[in-house]
């Protein structure tokens, strides 16, 4: 074992690897010598030989010697018997065969085999025999197969091509003889002992297995490969990975799998179980089995090529590659080591296995992977000729394999959509391997989650591939296509960071792309329809597409390869990188396929342009603008050579245009090509192909594949996948059909028909993913525009605009693709963005700017409603908006239907959001093009993204990922990252921003500087959490600024459009007249306003873009629900016109909740739609009674006010501040983009006027809802339904409203998720505030002020806090004044109006709530409905009503909704909870106004309010209402105090009046513990990177509040176990899930319990309980912020307010209690009550979380984050969800984040304990999304609650901050300690010490108790659990404490802190 055979062959190893191995061997020899010396000395001295042997351990060696006569390897020793027997049997069977292939294989492996075997039989023998077996298989099978396949590119080619390509390097041996040579040669070469050559025996043994497998594979592959099943993606994913090595169709495949097995062999070698796992028997068996399944995989060929080329072989040995250039380097590399993981990933079981392989991983990944990977990358970069360890042989490389390799990689990526993170990195097969190896345990998500890994792999392997394949245009192109736009961009910018995100983009792109491309069905369909080609978008797109045309994928791919190499090579050659090449290739391929597909059977590869000629009429509309943009872009992309030649032809121009706008423009061409081609060819296949080319390929294929594949494989990924596959199912059939019909109809029919069809397709695309939707919408818009304008250029423009979205949408990865495609194609993000923007706007901007005056008025009438709504698509604005408007008008119902059918609410809405992101963006984009070009040159991506269609694409990517795309953007991060790669290079903020936009709205994503930053953060967007996180972040950035921009302009438009839309929407949102009226109103009346808003939009272009995605996302979450989804989708489409948005929502969702959801999102979307939202909500409530009326009147009223406030006030600051923040976020967060972005957003928001900030906050809240919707709509869309079911909430599941409620839940969740994003807190508060504000606004004519007021306190953290924080340094006092003024205004009219309106709405809501509880009004009864109702109620001032009505059921549901919609709806649930008390209805309204005033007063103390408001976000209004007088004044005074002294904040919050602040702070703190930790880390980084002014308040808030409040909270938790107990039940539930989730859940559960307690005693008892809860919760909230805040809101407005504002609430209810003895009384007197109630509620909640864990557990963390510190916690959740991309390094961090969103919703406890509690691998609390390392550990710490805070030890977090903050923190700590908060020592020293030890025991019992009561309580509404609660409170609290104070968390946190610091 120790002795190294003489002939050890390291040829399969890198030099470094071999060196390391040799070093190990040498050291082993030295050790053996030393041991022998020692033994010899002992032997000399010792008497007894036996004793001597026993002492020396020689006895074991002796036994081994006796056992195995040959002292070879342990592996050999272990294996010889079996191997020998097998050898005998094999010798009988295939003596010659075994020897021949072995010899052949050993020819390459000879030295390595012998050396290996000598080195270690386990390692070497397994490796050698495996590798030889693999090589043998590959060598023999590949050559004949390969030749055959090459020769025959038909169906056989597909099956055979894989083997052929793979085998081509091997190429010489027949398949039959493949197995023979290995054993003999192995024996000969390995130098193994003669008795039985372990290598030989193994080889022979596996030879037999291989023969069997080969035969099976051949049979299967011959039969099945030709009949690839498109939906075998789940299996094919793994199979794909398997196929990475198995290029031979059957034998090659199985051989490859053997190779993969050989790869696994490394792991097998590394660990004792090698014989079992290392044996080819198992792996090849698996391969055979998977081969059987693989036949389903239509991409075996592609897979093989891709795998082989991308990874050489997935297996360690990489026979074909190894044989070729550098077997030594190519065989045993990090990648090869990774490939066992990759290989495992290929097989479904393999990924798990790979994760199980960590035992081997250390050797493979640690020892070889990193160095080898780095060296590998260098080598690859250094010389193209030198094959990296995993590189493919040149043979394979330039044969079809590259295409297939990329395709296969892509396929693998997508097929592993469940492991989207993994597949995304897989796109670069090489990248995938190292990542796999790097994080074996995290392999599936590591690539995606680890930006660095991604970067490394992308860089290392893509560069290597570039070098390897750089010579081949096709490969570079294909590689780029594999990476999609990102690949081009990555390659353009450069592989290092670009590729990092390329990988992600591959993730993102590929997940959808792979879905579309990797889906065998599509592939096979592609044969007929060219869909399969698009299955492999970039790599295989043209090739496979042509192959599809030719029905011979391999041949087609080869031909395509050649042709593409001919055409794209021009691009590639000029580009050098495959940027343009890939873009061109992708686009060329696509266009070739798209345009050439119509002559499907023709030589499309070279004729695509000829085909384009044939399609010239169709192309003509594209040509006008695309030609010039194409030319410019192509020249930029250096696609111009081919592009020029192509440009000569219209369609070639289109492809050129496509190559130029890789994702954006190409899809445009594709879209129009589809339309044109559909028109020209009018073939459903062609439209499908075209659609596939542009959107179907991306969207339809992606959708279908994702739906189908995601259905199979996406479920592991979580909701993002679910969204994808939900969409896909519809999309492929429907979308294709719709596309075929739509394309034909659109082309044939004029504006209306395409609008209808397109809208249909758009919904499909939307449904398929936000991205798809946007693409469809854009296509529809561009088609409609073209037809509307009769303007080929414009249509092309829109087509270009649409296809980017389509492509971006089509591929989750596409999102970065547009950014990178557009930007990277251009070469630089800015230039590309500008180019895209200009190209876009060449036909769109020029059309927009030129024809916008004319077209906008004309189109605005129709489009205005949508234009305002579609302004978010401002990039596409005119065309897109126009398209959208007609689309909405013409096919509003169809879209609704499809959206509804789609059930991709967040995606659907999201796409629309992207489409209608900027109602005024068209106009604004004209200005913004210039202004934003300048402004966004800072955030080049942001500006360009905003202006370009990239922006819409980004969200699609994000959507796709998490949802998605993960999901949408479940994998969004990767996609974003790919897109961000260039952005990342420019700025990390931009990159992060891009992902956010990606998640939120690509259109806005690119408009917002936050986009790029978000891109980085959300690169995991394939993970849904990431997507929504990006959304959140993007919408935090975008939402903030965009809400201002959206608000005033959209608000005006909305108001004007809303009036018509109110009617139209109420009647039928789809009525063109309404849209036209709305558009006219928007276009006509708000023309000046629009100009103003445009100017303002230019300023806050990024901001403007953000909210719309929120709105859309919010709407999307509604679409997630059945009616809500459609309504909101349509509303989102008409989101610009809020009235339209809200009105349609009202009728469809069955009224108010929908409207509330929509109104809220719309209002949030509108910069100052708060008032309108409130009015809209009022209108909604009335619309329940009188649908149009409420919307109508408030709409008129609010617009002016909001416009004046938001437009006038906000226009000045929003953009600049926001941009700075954006930039900061980008630069701040590479890994922790979210956190930095959060800080950025915060700082950006403070830079905006408070009103604007409030408006932004509202929008952001809405966007948060939307984002949360997008994320949770995607991740929760399913989970929401699951939640609803799982929640056991009859009301929730009631009747038809549950779907709306579900959407609403998603909407709520979306805001919360959004809040979880960088501005998690702010967003968190924002939904609540916005609801509160909306309620106030709605309730009062002072609504805007009220809304602002409430929002200010509520948005204090987000909006006022950040807007005021923008003003905190510059307008803090002004905000204070504003707040006071608003408070005054609020107090008088708001209190009365809100009281009246609140009562009215409360009654409205209450009636529905009660009815909903009963079941008639499913909305309130449902948790989401309750959330929405509570939100609506809060919006409409019915905070108390809804909760009061549904107290028993509702509070629980509300809480559940809060939990389910935790991210977005937690705040709202809190508000709902707050609203729960009907007794407090009026007091709630009054308190709301008071609280608003108070919050307004608090606004000046934004830093303090930040956290305080986070505690108060949901209950800002409610809490304010509840604690209007004392809380108001106290809070105002306190907030001022806090503002004056940040440390005073903690003290103030400690004080009675600080109860609110404290609660907020505690909530914030807990969230800070969670998200605050990461956020603080990010903030600390931000403080280092952001101006102290901007950062300081926020950071201060985070630091102080997180620290002092966390400390105080922890102290309180320690002191007030009852509070902790409520948390404890939650932790009990979530402790399983995740300490992080536990804390959140505990808080949420506590809140829920309190809510339910309040429900039990909504009146004074509830309030006292709530006050107690608040008091306890405040302390407890410090530990678990969410608890305090949630219970107050749960308990009712008063209770919620008291809980939120603590003292004010208690002032209201128990004024002396909270006020006089604030904390002490809260500690003691309230404590018993509250603990009881809280415990009861917590038990209920916990049980609910457990009983309905999926809905409740997730919402609960969200509730916790959303409610108490919605910003922090929501941020945490959002960040976690979004950060999963970052957390991809975690095992399941990315997937877990998405899964967390999903799991919390659907799997909840079960998932969370595994996922969430799994070291809180960021997934549990979605914090993983926040930061990979930081979020992971920090999140765990935060999850740990007090300990997390303690472990954060605010000083540490603080240390990241400045000394100033540290001092403030210390002061806060001192104040907390001195002022009687929870004792500081336990908090500081070991928050977990007390809690773990003292609380742990009771924790378990409490947990159990809570579980049982919780199980009962969820149904009962927590009342039954109340007594238990008191009993359990103490145990529960320890649970929380324990959960909060996990030692691991502490360490993790510190590690994270270090990581953060290092990152900083």
Curated annotation (Swiss-Prot):
The modification Phosphoserine is found at residues 799, 802, 1027, 1083, 1117, 1493, 1724, 1739, 1789, 1819. Residues 325-334, 342-366, 635-645, 808-835, 910-920, 933-945, 1062-1074, 1356-1365, 1470-1493, 1520-1533, 1637-1657, 1732-1741 have a biased composition (Polar residues). InterPro entries: EXPH5, Rab_BD. One of its GO terms (biological process) is positive regulation of protein secretion. Residues 7-63 form the RabBD domain. One of its GO terms (cellular component) is endosome. The keyword Lipid metabolism does not apply. Interacts with RAB27A. This is Exophilin-5. It comes from Mus musculus. The gene is Exph5.
């Amino acid at each position: 074992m120790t002795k190294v055979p003489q002939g050890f062959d390291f040829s399969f190893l890198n030099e470094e690897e071999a060196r390391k191995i040799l070093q190990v061997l040498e050291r082993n020899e030295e050790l053996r010598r030393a041991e022998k010396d020692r033994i010899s000395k002992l032997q000399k001295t010792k008497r007894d030989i036996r004793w001597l042997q026993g002492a020396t351990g020689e006895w074991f060696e002796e036994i081994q010697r006796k056992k195995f006569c040959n002292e070879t390897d342990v592996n050999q020793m272990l294996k010889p018997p079996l191997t020998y027997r097998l050898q005998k049997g094999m010798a009988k069977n295939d003596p010659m065969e075994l020897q021949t292939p072995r010899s052949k294989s050993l020819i390459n492996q000879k030295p390595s085999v012998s050396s290996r075997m000598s080195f270690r039989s386990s390692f070497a023998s397994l490796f050698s025999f495996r590798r030889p077996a693999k090589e043998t298989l590959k060598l023999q099978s590949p050559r004949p197969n390969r030749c055959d396949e090459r020769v025959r590119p038909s169906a056989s080619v597909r099956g055979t091509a894989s083997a052929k390509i793979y085998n081509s390097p091997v190429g010489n041996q027949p398949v039959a003889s493949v197995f023979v040579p290995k054993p003999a040669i192995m024996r000969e070469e390995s130098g193994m002992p003669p008795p039985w050559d372990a290598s030989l025996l193994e080889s022979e043994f596996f030879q037999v297995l291989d023969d069997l497998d080969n035969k099976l594979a051949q049979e299967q592959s011959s039969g099945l490969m030709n009949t690839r099943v498109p939906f075998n993606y789940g299996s094919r994913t793994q199979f794909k990975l398997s196929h990475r090595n198995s290029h031979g169709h059957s034998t090659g495949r199985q051989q490859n799998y053997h190779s993969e097995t050989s790869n696994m062999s490394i792991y097998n070698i590394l660990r004792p179980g090698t014989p079992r796992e290392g044996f080819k028997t198992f792996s090849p068996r698996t391969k055979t089995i998977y081969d059987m399944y693989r036949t389903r995989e239509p991409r075996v060929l592609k897979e093989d090529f891709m795998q082989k080329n991308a990874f050489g072989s997935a297996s360690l040995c990489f026979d074909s590659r190894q044989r070729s250039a550098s077997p030594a380097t190519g065989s045993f590399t990090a990648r090869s080591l990774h490939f066992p993981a990759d290989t495992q990933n290929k097989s479904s079981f393999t990924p798990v296995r790979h994760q199980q392989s960590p035992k081997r991983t250390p050797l493979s990944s640690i020892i070889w992977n990193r160095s080898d990977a780095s060296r590998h990358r260098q080598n690859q970069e250094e010389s193209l000729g030198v094959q990296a360890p995993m590189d493919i042989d040149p043979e394979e490389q330039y044969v079809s394999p590259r295409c297939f390799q990329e395709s296969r990689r892509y396929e693998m990526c997508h097929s592993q959509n469940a492991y989207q993170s993994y597949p995304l990195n897989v796109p670069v097969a090489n990248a995938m391997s190292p990542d796999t190896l790097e994080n074996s345990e995290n392999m599936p998500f590591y690539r995606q989650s680890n930006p660095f890994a991604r970067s490394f792999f992308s860089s290392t392997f893509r560069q290597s591939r570039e070098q390897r394949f750089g010579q081949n245009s096709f490969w570079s192109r294909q590689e780029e296509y594999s990476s999609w736009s990102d690949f081009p961009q990555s390659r353009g910018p450069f592989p290092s960071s670009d590729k990092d995100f390329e990988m992600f983009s591959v993730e993102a792109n590929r997940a959808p792309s792979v879905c579309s491309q990797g889906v065998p069905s599509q592939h096979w369909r592609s044969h007929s329809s060219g869909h399969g080609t698009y299955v492999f978008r970039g790599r295989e797109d043209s090739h496979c597409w042509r192959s599809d045309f030719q029905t011979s994928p391999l041949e087609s791919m080869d031909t395509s390869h050649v042709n593409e190499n001919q055409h794209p090579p021009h691009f590639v050659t000029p580009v050098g990188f495959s940027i343009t090449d890939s873009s061109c290739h992708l686009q060329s391929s696509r266009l070739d396929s798209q345009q050439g597909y119509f002559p499907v059977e023709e030589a499309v590869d070279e004729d695509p342009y000829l085909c384009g000629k044939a399609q010239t009429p169709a192309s003509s509309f594209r040509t006008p603008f695309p030609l010039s943009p194409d030319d410019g872009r192509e020249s930029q992309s250096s696609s111009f050579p081919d592009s020029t030649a192509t440009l000569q032809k219209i369609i070639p121009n289109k492809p050129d245009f496509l190559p130029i706008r890789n994702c954006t423009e190409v899809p445009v061409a594709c879209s129009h090509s589809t339309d044109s081609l559909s028109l020209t060819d009018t073939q459903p296949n062609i439209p499908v192909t075209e659609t596939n080319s542009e959107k179907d390929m991306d969207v339809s294929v992606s959708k279908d594949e994702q739906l189908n594949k995601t259905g199979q494989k996406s479920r592991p990924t979580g909701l993002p996948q679910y969204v994808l596959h939900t969409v896909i199912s519809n999309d492929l059939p429907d979308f294709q059909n719709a596309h075929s019909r739509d394309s034909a109809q659109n082309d044939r029919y004029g504006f209306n028909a395409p609008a209808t069809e397109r809208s249909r397709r758009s919904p499909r695309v939307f449904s398929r993913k936000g991205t798809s939707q946007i693409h469809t919408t854009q296509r529809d818009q561009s088609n409609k525009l073209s037809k509307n304008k009769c303007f080929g250029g414009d249509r092309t423009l829109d087509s270009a605009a649409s296809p980017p979205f389509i492509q971006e949408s089509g591929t989750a990865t596409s999102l970065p693709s547009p950014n990178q495609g557009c930007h990277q194609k251009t070469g630089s993000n800015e230039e590309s963005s500008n180019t895209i923007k200009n190209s876009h706007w060449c036909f769109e901007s020029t059309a927009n700017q030129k024809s916008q005056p004319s077209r906008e008025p004309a189109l605005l009438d129709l489009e205005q409603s949508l234009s305002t709504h579609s302004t978010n698509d401002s990039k596409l604005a005119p065309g897109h908006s126009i398209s959208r408007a007609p689309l909405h008008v013409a096919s509003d119902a169809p879209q609704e239907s499809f959206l509804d059918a789609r059930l991709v609410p967040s995606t659907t809405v999201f796409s629309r959001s992207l489409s209608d992101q900027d109602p005024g963006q068209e106009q604004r984009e004209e200005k913004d093009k210039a202004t934003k070009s300048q402004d966004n040159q800072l955030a080049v991506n942001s500006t360009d993204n905003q202006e370009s269609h990239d922006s819409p694409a980004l969200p699609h990517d994000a959507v796709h990922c998490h949802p998605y795309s993960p999901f949408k953007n479940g994998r969004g991060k990767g996609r974003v990252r790919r897109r961000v790669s260039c952005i990342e290079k420019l700025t990390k903020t931009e990159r992060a921003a891009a992902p956010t936009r990606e998640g939120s709205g690509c259109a806005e994503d690119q408009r917002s500087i936050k986009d790029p930053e978000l891109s980085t953060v959300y690169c995991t967007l394939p993970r849904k959490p990431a997507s929504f996180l990006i959304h959140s972040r993007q919408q935090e950035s975008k939402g903030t600024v965009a809400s201002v921009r959206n608000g005033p302009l959209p608000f005006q438009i909305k108001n004007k459009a809303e009036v018509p839309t109110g009617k139209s929407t109420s009647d039928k949102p789809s009525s063109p007249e309404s849209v036209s009226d709305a558009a006219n109103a928007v276009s006509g009346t708000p023309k000046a306003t629009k100009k103003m808003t445009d100017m303002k939009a230019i300023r806050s272009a990024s901001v403007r873009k953000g909210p719309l995605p929120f709105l859309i996302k919010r709407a999307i979450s509604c679409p997630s629900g059945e009616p809500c989804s459609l309504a909101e989708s349509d509303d989102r489409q008409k989101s610009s016109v809020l009235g339209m948005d809200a009105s349609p929502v009202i009728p469809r969702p069955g009224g108010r909740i929908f409207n509330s959801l929509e109104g809220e999102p719309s209002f949030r979307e509108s910069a100052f739609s708060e008032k309108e939202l409130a009015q809209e909500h009022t209108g909604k409530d009335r619309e329940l009674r009188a649908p149009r009326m409420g919307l109508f009147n408030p709409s008129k009223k609010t617009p002016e006010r909001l416009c004046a406030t938001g437009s006038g006030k906000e226009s000045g600051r929003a953009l600049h501040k926001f941009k700075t923040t954006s930039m900061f976020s980008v630069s701040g967060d590479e890994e922790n983009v979210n956190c930095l972005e959060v800080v950025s957003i915060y700082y950006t928001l403070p830079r905006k006027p408070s009103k604007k900030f409030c408006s932004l906050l509202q929008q952001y809240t809405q966007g948060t809802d939307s984002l949360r919707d997008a994320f949770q709509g995607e991740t929760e869309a399913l989970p929401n339904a699951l939640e609803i079911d799982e929640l056991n909430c009859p009301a929730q599941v009631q009747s038809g409203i549950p779907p709306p409620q579900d959407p609403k839940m998603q909407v709520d969740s979306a805001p919360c998720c959004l809040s979880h994003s960088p501005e998690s807190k702010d967003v968190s508060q924002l939904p609540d505030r916005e609801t509160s504000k909306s309620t106030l606004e709605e309730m009062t004519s002072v609504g805007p002020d009220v809304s602002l007021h409430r929002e200010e306190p509520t948005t204090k953290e987000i909006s006022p806090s950040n807007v005021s924080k923008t003003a905190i340094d510059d307008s803090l006092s002004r905000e204070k004044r504003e707040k006071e003024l608003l408070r005054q205004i609020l107090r008088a009219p708001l209190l009365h109006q809100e009281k009246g309106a609140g009562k009215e709405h409360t009654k409205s809501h209450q009636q529905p709530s009660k009815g909903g509880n009963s079941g008639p009004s499913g909305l309130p009864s449902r948790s989401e409905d309750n959330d929405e109702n509570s939100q609506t109620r809060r919006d409409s001032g019915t905070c108390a009503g809804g909760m009061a009505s549904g107290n028993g059921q509702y509070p629980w549901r509300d809480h559940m909704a809060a939990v389910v919609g935790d991210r977005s709806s937690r705040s709202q649930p809190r508000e709902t909870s707050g609203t729960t008390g009907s007794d407090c209805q009026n007091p709630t309204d009054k308190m709301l106004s008071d609280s608003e005033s108070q919050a307004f007063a608090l606004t000046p103390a934004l830093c303090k309010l930040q956290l305080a408001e986070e505690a108060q976000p949901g209950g800002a209004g409610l809490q304010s209402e509840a604690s209007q007088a004392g809380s108001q004044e106290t809070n105002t005074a306190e907030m001022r105090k806090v503002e004056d002294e940040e440390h005073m904040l903690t003290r103030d919050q400690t004080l009675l009046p600080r109860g609110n602040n404290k609660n907020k702070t505690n909530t914030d703190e807990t969230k800070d513990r969670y998200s605050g930790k990461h956020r603080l880390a990010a903030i600390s980084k931000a403080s280092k990177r952001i101006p102290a002014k901007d950062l300081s308040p926020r950071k201060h808030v985070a630091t102080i509040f997180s620290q002092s409040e966390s400390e105080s909270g922890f102290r309180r938790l320690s002191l007030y176990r009852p509070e902790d107990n409520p948390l404890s039940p939650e932790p009990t539930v979530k402790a399983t899930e995740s300490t992080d989730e536990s804390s959140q859940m505990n808080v949420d559960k506590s809140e829920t319990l309190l809510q339910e307690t309040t429900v039990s005693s909504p009146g004074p008892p509830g309030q006292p309980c709530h006050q107690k809860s608040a008091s306890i919760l405040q302390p407890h909230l410090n530990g678990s912020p969410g608890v305090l805040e949630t219970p107050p809101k749960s308990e009712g407005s008063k209770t919620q307010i008291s809980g939120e504002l603590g003292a004010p609430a208690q002032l209201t209810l128990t004024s002396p209690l909270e006020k006089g003895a604030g904390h002490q009384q809260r500690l003691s007197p309230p404590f018993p009550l509250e603990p009881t109630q809280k415990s009861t509620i917590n038990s209920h909640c916990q049980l609910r979380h457990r009983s309905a864990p999926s809905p409740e557990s997730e919402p609960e963390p969200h509730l916790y984050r959303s409610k108490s510190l919605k910003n922090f916690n929501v941020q945490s959740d959002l960040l976690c969800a979004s950060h999963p991309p970052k957390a991809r390094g975690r095992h399941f961090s990315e997937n877990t984040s998405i899964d967390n969103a999903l799991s919390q919703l659907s799997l909840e406890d079960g998932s969370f304990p595994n996922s969430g509690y799994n070291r809180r691998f960021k997934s549990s609390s979605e914090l993983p999304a926040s930061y990979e390392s930081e979020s992971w550990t920090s999140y765990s710490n935060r999850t740990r609650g007090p300990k997390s805070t303690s472990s954060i030890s605010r000083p540490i977090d603080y240390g990241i901050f400045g000394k100033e903050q540290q001092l403030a923190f210390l002061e806060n700590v001192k104040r907390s300690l001195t002022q009687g908060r929870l004792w500081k020592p336990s908090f500081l020293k070991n928050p977990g010490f007390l809690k773990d030890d003292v609380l742990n025991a009771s924790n378990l019992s409490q947990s159990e108790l809570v579980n049982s009561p919780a199980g009962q309580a969820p149904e009962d509404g927590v009342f039954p659990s109340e007594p238990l609660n008191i009993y359990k409170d103490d145990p529960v609290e320890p649970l929380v404490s324990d959960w909060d104070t996990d030692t691991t968390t502490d360490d993790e946190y510190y590690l994270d802190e270090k990581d953060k610091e290092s990152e900083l």
